[in-house]
Amino acid sequence: MRAPHLHLSAASGARALAKLLPLLMAQLWAAEAALLPQNDTRLDPEAYGSPCARGSQPWQVSLFNGLSFHCAGVLVDQSWVLTAAHCGNKPLWARVGDDHLLLLQGEQLRRTTRSVVHPKYHQGSGPILPRRTDEHDLMLLKLARPVVLGPRVRALQLPYRCAQPGDQCQVAGWGTTAARRVKYNKGLTCSSITILSPKECEVFYPGVVTNNMICAGLDRGQDPCQSDSGGPLVCDETLQGILSWGVYPCGSAQHPAVYTQICKYMSWINKVIRSN
């Protein structure tokens, strides 16, 4: 007697695929990340931040273009991730609550279905960093379905005031850790940085930084690098900036990083989220 055949409808097949796809993607990412070079052990690891405590950055998002790590981002709503506009508006995969490129530790995988770039953003070409002195460098990404909020995944609070010079803040990322060659950390690295005044920033980047940008850095060797583009600047557990651009060498205390200042864009962010 023949065993009965199982027939799957198109709908049930799609549901099964949707359940399997996140696991498959995670396995492929792990295989891809395993090929990334290890950190340079000749360098002082304390000079480039330290590993973030597990689950301490539940708003952190890694954005992938296929299997390639593309940019960082931050969860600002159950259905929305904020990142830098220069990361491009192609469909991406978002790993929300991610703190390790190799391990699955409670993050949630979502496809982005829509991108909303700030209407005044135009990729520029400045005198210091060609194509990296862009004003209004913000983009909101809508997730295919809302994330489930909990201890490992939660939205970062938007600012009720602007950060002030001297404020101590934190950045986290998987970015380059040495100027000699580009490489990624597998684990999320946290670094402490200080908000600079506009006058201090002008010394480093004369005539380049606008009132919609904010500089932070100067703590020894802890500036984030360009491969952390789109990552959050967090001050007192509120979002104050999105990493827009900086100057090589990575980890150089001589050049602060430049962020899009989130407090200047609250109306736009809230309008996009409410209307979509």
UniProtKB/Swiss-Prot annotation:
Gene Ontology CC entries for this record: extracellular region; extracellular space; secretory granule
Gene for this chain: KLK10
Function: Has a tumor-suppressor role for NES1 in breast and prostate cancer.
Leader sequence segment: 1-30
PANTHER family in the record: KALLIKREIN-10, KALLIKREIN-RELATED
Source organism: Homo sapiens
Disulfide bonds: 52-162, 71-87, 169-235, 201-215, 225-250
EC class of the enzyme, as a word: hydrolase
Tissue expression per record: Expressed in breast, ovary and prostate.
InterPro entries: Peptidase_S1_PA (IPR009003), Peptidase_S1_PA_chymotrypsin (IPR043504), Peptidase_S1A (IPR001314), Trypsin_dom (IPR001254), TRYPSIN_HIS (IPR018114)
GO MF annotation terms: serine-type endopeptidase activity; serine-type peptidase activity
Name of this chain's protein: Kallikrein-10
UniProt-annotated glycosylation sites, renumbered to this chain: 39
Pfam families: Trypsin
Superkingdom assignment: Eukaryota
Any one GO BP annotation for this protein: protein maturation
